[in-house]
Amino acid sequence: MFNLRRLFASALFLGLGLLFLAQTAEAAKGPKITHKVYFDITQGDQPLGRVVMGLYGKTVPETTENFRALATGEKGFGYEGSAFHRVIKNFMIQGGDFTKGDGTGGKSIYGDRFKDENFKLKHTKKGLLSMANAGRDTNGSQFFITTVVTSWLDGKHVVFGEVLEGYEIIEKIENSKTGAADRPVEAVKIAKSGELDVPPEGLVGTSEFAAEEVASAGWSPMQKAGLFAIFAGVLFVGLRSARQHSRF
């Protein structure tokens, strides 16, 4: 009987250990990138280059679709030709107001404004895309790209993507000379925008995110293996115990 208990405990601890390792491995991967979009950016008459961004469509599908469709312009309106109207060094660069250009306009593909989808992802690093707003549930088309960790924005702004390529261009914009209302003296514009292909299995973002994002994504193969190990261990102990009892 003692050996059975020890075997049961070993199986249980093995399964729980596998679950822990699976959770840790998944957390190290970061959120799933389902779409890629690009901005070809100019400053004045000079091209700065292309910024490629990955969007977290599994975690925030509605916010991702809004940004993706505005990047392609498939609804008849979008980011192409609009400016980065607000730049604050050691904070962020902000754009997306394609109706007024001064931070008071813009609109979403769902109407004028749409609700905060969720706050599962945090502002844990530079190069993140997050929705600009005027308060709760006031998302439109305006967005910002972080240039530092901005944890004070957690729970207030929806993180939905990250810069994959061209972050040096973001740094150039961040270091632009600005005037009133933090507007760049020399206009910084999105000359062209669109969508790029993503492999069918998707891509994975970088790892500076809380484990709650992993939990929201469902069970991974490694986590399923851990559960199977626990189940198999318990089943084995149960069968062995039944055999021993059948001898008496």
Curated annotation (Swiss-Prot):
Molecular function per GO: cyclosporin A binding; peptidyl-prolyl cis-trans isomerase activity
Keyword line: Endoplasmic reticulum, Glycoprotein, Isomerase, Membrane, Rotamase, Signal, Transmembrane, Transmembrane helix
Keyword Lipoprotein: no
EC numbers for this chain: 5.2.1.8
Primary enzyme class: isomerase
Transmembrane segments: 219-239
GO CC field: endoplasmic reticulum lumen; fungal-type vacuole; membrane
Catalyzed chemical reaction(s): [protein]-peptidylproline (omega=180) = [protein]-peptidylproline (omega=0)
Keyword flag Amino-acid biosynthesis: no
Gene3D superfamilies referenced in this protein's UniProt entry, alphabetically: Cyclophilin-like
Residues carrying sugar: 139
Activity regulation, per record: Inhibited by cyclosporin A (CsA).
PPIase cyclophilin-type domain: residues covered: 38-195
Cross-referenced PANTHER family: PEPTIDYL-PROLYL CIS-TRANS ISOMERASE, PEPTIDYL-PROLYL CIS-TRANS ISOMERASE D-RELATED
Functional summary from the UniProt entry: PPIases accelerate the folding of proteins. It catalyzes the cis-trans isomerization of proline imidic peptide bonds in oligopeptides.
Protein name listed in UniProt: Peptidyl-prolyl cis-trans isomerase B
Gene it is expressed from: CPR2
